[in-house]
């Protein structure tokens, strides 16, 4: 079923059909950091990274996952954004950058909240493992689960310029492995990165389509 008013399937309408009501993502900061930015790695991080720019005011790493969810629901409700379904969106940082016991505890706390119907895990394609996918697959039997990979570009040259720390082949492997578990997979791409031409931006279209993603974000 396609949205009759848009030349593409928009995220909101698609999720409404799938989950049976208006869906609101609630950003969560699990304070897991990033393997590409921490002091031990000495890699410096991506040149474009500024986590504070997209972290909502209600995300407070001093608060528990449950407290952040409560604050997020209050935040959206006060702005007339109440929803029928809520998804805990582990957005800030790399949300698979921990041992599986820690991840299980964090994800389980979110899913134990009575208002939460599923989780979306934002992470890097070079920070996923079969053990983590096992965990997410187990959750997916009872809840909506999606993984959102920061791919940013299909060009290895551009990825090196922005010090991304992985190549495009790594992203393809991560997406393929995740989809094999019947878990929804999304990806972020940044258009207009340094040294990227308009022709290169447009040429990515077929490559991105070949990933068969369930959803995609362009920045």
Describe each model-derived feature in a short phrase.
Residues 52-72, 76-100, 115-128, 144-170, ...:
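Core AdoMet radical
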Residues 100-108, 129-138, 199-201:
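Distinct, well-ordered alpha-helical segments
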């Amino acid at each position: 079923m396609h949205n009759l008013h848009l030349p593409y399937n928009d995220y909101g309408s698609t999720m409404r059909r799938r989950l049976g009501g208006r869906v609101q993502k609630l950003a969560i900061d699990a304070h897991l950091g990033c393997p590409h930015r921490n002091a031990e790695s000495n890699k410096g991080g991506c040149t474009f990274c500024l986590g504070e720019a997209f972290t909502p005011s209600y995300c407070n790493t001093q608060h528990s996952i449950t407290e952040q969810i409560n604050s997020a629901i209050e935040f959206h409700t006060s702005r007339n954004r109440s929803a029928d379904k809520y998804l805990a969106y582990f957005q800030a940082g790399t949300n698979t950058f921990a041992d599986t016991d820690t991840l299980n505890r964090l994800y389980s706390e979110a899913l134990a909240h009575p208002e939460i119907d599923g989780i979306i895990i934002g992470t890097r394609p070079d920070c996923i493992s079969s053990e983590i996918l096992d965990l997410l697959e187990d959750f997916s039997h009872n809840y909506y689960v999606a993984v959102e990979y920061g791919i940013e570009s299909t060009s290895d040259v551009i990825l090196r310029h922005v010090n991304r720390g992985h190549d495009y082949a790594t992203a393809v492997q991560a997406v393929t492995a995740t989809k094999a578990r019947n878990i929804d997979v999304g990806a972020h791409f940044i258009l207009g990165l340094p040294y990227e031409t308009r022709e290169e931006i447009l040429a990515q279209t077929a490559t991105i389509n070949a990933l068969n993603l369930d959803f995609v974000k362009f920045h």
